[in-house]
C-alpha cells in the first residue's frame, strides 16, 4: 500500500470513529453538482462524459450512506431547468446514462435500496427513461432491508409545491369542501402529504458538491430546517472522507429548527 493510501485509510478510520458517536442524519439530500467541470478538469474532450462518471459514482456514495446507517437518501439527478436549458444532444446522452445506471445498479433482483422517484417523468424524460425508472421502482418495492433512495429527476421544488396544492384542491373539491372552508382549515401537513416525497422524513442534512452554495430549487419545502454542507470537490471526485467530514460537521451542530 502506498504511503498516501495508508494515510487516507487511517484518516477515514478516524473519521468513522468520530461520526459513530453521532448524532447522525436520518435523511440526507445530495445535490451532485460539477460533473461537466470535473470532465473539463480531467481533460476530456466532451464535458458531458462527466455525467456518466457522476452517475456511476452514485452507487459508491449510497454504500457509504448505508454503512453509516442513513435510512433515507434523496439524490438530485436533474432539474426541470436542466432538461429545458441543455442542448438536445446533452439531454439525450444524460437520459441514456440514467437508463443504464438505473438498470445495472438499482433495478436488480438483489437490490439493496428501495427506489422512489420525485419529479415529473412523462413530460421532460424520454419514454424509455421513464419506463426504466418506473421498472426500478417496481423491482425494488419489496426491498425493506436497506436505505430508501429517492431519485429527483425532472424535479423542481417550486413546481412540487404547485402540484401539491393543485392535488389538494382537487381532493377537497371531490369531497365537497368549499374554498372558504379549505382556506380556514389549511395546514402545513395538508401540503406535505401531497408532495412528491409524501411519507418520507424531511432531510436533516443537504450536501452539495462543486463549491456552489445554493439550493437550486431542491426540496424547498422539505429543507426549511435542514443543515447545509457545501463541499469544494466536484461530484465524481467526492470521496468517502468528504462524506464523513459532512457527517462530522452535522454531528457538531446544534439544530434549532428556526428557533
UniProtKB/Swiss-Prot annotation:
Mg(2+) binds at residues 33, 227. SUPFAM superfamilies: Undecaprenyl diphosphate synthase. It comes from Streptomyces fradiae. Its EC number is 2.5.1.-. Belongs to the UPP synthase family. The keyword Metal-binding applies. Catalyzes the condensation of isopentenyl diphosphate (IPP) with allylic pyrophosphates generating different type of terpenoids. The active site is at residues 33, 82. The keyword Hydrolase does not apply. HAMAP family: ISPT. This is Isoprenyl transferase. Binds 2 magnesium ions per subunit. GO terms for cellular component: plasma membrane. Homodimer. Its cofactor is Mg(2+).
